[in-house]
């Protein structure tokens, strides 16, 4: 162990002396170059993508606000643009059934990403534990179109 009590690093792959014996085999230069180029593009487009997602977020939130019975779990300006959590206040609405029915069109989720497959501590902290089956999380990205947003809004309207 080192001075901090951390055990020494062991080899990831055995058989060669590349990377000071920590990794065997020739490095995949094409993957390294591809990753570097992807990072370069991501950095180059960061501001434009951020602006686009903020614009799409406003379109989605505006559309959702026109649907009676649907509310944002966090309408605050402090929420991250592009991640929209809503509660559908319809008696027989079940988020998992709804997601399954539209999974060929949209990728939605229940609750928070921090607790996939379990009751979300975020939803509980917001005081929504009794409505956990009515929460949907909508995530937008640079590939989301306004047409898709309007389609989802129309599907949500038809659900209520």
Region locations from a protein language model:
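PLP-dependent enzyme catalytic core of the Aspartate aminotransferase-like
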Residues: 121-160
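Conserved core segment of the aminotransferase class I/II
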Residues: 1-47
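Conserved C-terminal alpha-helix-loop-beta "cap" of PLP-dependent enzymes
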Residues: 83-137
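Glycine-rich beta-alpha junction loops
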Residues: 15-18, 39, 60, 88-90, ...
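Conserved PLP-dependent catalytic core of the aminotransferase class-I/II
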Residues: 43-92, 96-101
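Predominant activation on well-ordered alpha-helical scaffold segments within soluble catalytic domains
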Residues: 29-40, 61, 99, 120-123, ...
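Structural detector of well-ordered beta-strand residues that form the stable sheet scaffold
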Residues: 10, 73, 107-109
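Generic structural signal for well-ordered, non-membrane alpha-helical segments
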Residues: 24, 28-32, 46-57, 95, ...
């Amino acid at each position: 162990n080192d001075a901090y009590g951390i055990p020494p690093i062991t080899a990831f792959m055995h058989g060669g002396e590349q990377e000071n014996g920590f990794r065997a085999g020739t490095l995949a230069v094409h993957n390294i170059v591809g990753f570097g180029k992807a990072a370069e593009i991501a950095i180059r487009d960061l501001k434009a993508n951020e602006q686009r997602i903020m614009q799409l977020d406003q379109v989605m939130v505006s559309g959702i606000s026109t649907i009676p019975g649907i509310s944002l779990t966090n309408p605050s300006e402090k929420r991250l643009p592009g991640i929209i959590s809503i509660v559908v206040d319809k008696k027989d609405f079940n988020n998992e059934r709804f997601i399954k029915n539209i999974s060929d069109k949209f990728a939605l989720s229940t609750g928070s990403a921090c607790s996939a497959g379990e009751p979300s501590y975020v939803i509980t902290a917001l005081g929504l534990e009794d409505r956990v089956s009515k929460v949907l999380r909508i995530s937008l990205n640079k590939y989301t179109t306004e047409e898709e947003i309007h389609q989802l809004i129309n599907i949500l309207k038809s659900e209520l």
